[in-house]
């Protein structure tokens, strides 16, 4: 068995966080790609690794570590080289963790709403109601989310609320970068907070919500900087973006641009 074994899904935003840290650290890892719509994450062998039935899960020397935020910090703890992704002072570390908590509670769940409505809904609409309910009930951490969406998608008020939360997060991000002096959230050094928000911003751009930072130059510069990081390209290999997997999304984005 390799030292690092990553169970994940290419388009999963939480998986993308962990892939980025592994790549930034230069750590060799074996990737096991799970088909979430086929229910790979609910197989008994995977549930032994991650009882929550979600991705990602990292197995390090045979021991599982779950939850993307926990995995990221674990990797930085055991491999601080070539450069630590956490502030060196207790106060800086506390501020980074507070920011990561905000990211996990506000924009990360919010971006799932337009993602599901725009990309994943046709898959659920092809199911019977009983099949859909059974699927929702099988996902301990996503049950309420899926049931609130239903097979008809999230209603307009839910979409509006999600977009408002994303706009609020982008505004706060712009302000934090300005206050820190940039180019990153915590100032001069890339941190786990940047990597935590990265998949949200990349997803927003992918599903044509990038106008949220048209008047936020700090966020635009931040996105250019993280795209230029050596870990970005191997993290976002082909098939990691929704527009690369779902042709109807790519067509929609092209029409919007035209």
What spans do the regions from the language model cover?
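Short, solvent-exposed turn/loop segments enriched in Gly/Ser/Thr/Pro and often Arg
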Residues: 9, 35, 192, 239-240
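GST-like fold's C-terminal all-alpha helical module
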Residues: 108-224
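Short polybasic/polar patches that bind polyanions
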Residues: 23, 205, 228
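Long, positively charged, glycine-interspersed low-complexity recognition regions
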Residues: 213-258
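Short, hydrophobic secondary-structure boundary micro-motifs
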Residues: 83-88, 110-111, 185-187, 213, ...
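GST-like domain detector, emphasizing the conserved glutathione-binding G-site
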Residues: 1-141, 179-181, 253
């Amino acid at each position: 068995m390799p030292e690092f074994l990553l169970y994940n899904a290419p388009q999963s935003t939480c998986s993308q966080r962990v892939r980025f840290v592994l790549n930034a650290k230069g750590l060799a890892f074996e990737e096991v790609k799970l088909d979430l719509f086929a229910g790979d994450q609910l197989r008994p062998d995977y549930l032994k690794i991650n009882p929550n039935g979600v991705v990602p899960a990292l197995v390090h020397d045979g021991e599982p570590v779950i939850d993307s935020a926990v995995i990221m910090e674990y990797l930085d703890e055991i491999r601080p080289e070539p450069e630590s992704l956490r502030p060196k002072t207790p106060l800086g570390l506390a501020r980074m963790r507070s920011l990561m908590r905000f990211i996990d509670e506000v924009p990360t769940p919010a971006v799932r709403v337009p993602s599901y409505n725009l990309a994943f809904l046709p898959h659920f609409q092809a199911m019977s109601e009983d099949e859909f309910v059974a699927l929702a009930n099988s996902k301990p951490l996503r049950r309420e989310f899926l049931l609130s969406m239903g097979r008809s998608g999230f209603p307009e008020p839910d979409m509006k609320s999600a977009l408002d939360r994303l706009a609020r997060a982008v505004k706060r991000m712009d302000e934090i970068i300005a206050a820190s002096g940039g180019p990153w959230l915590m100032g001069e050094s890339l941190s786990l907070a940047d990597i935590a928000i990265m998949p949200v911003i990349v997803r927003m751009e992918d599903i044509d919500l990038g106008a949220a930072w048209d008047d936020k130059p700090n966020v635009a510069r931040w996105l250019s900087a993280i795209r230029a990081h050596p870990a970005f390209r191997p993290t976002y290999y082909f098939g990691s973006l929704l527009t690369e997997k779902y042709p109807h999304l790519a067509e929609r984005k092209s029409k919007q641009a035209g």
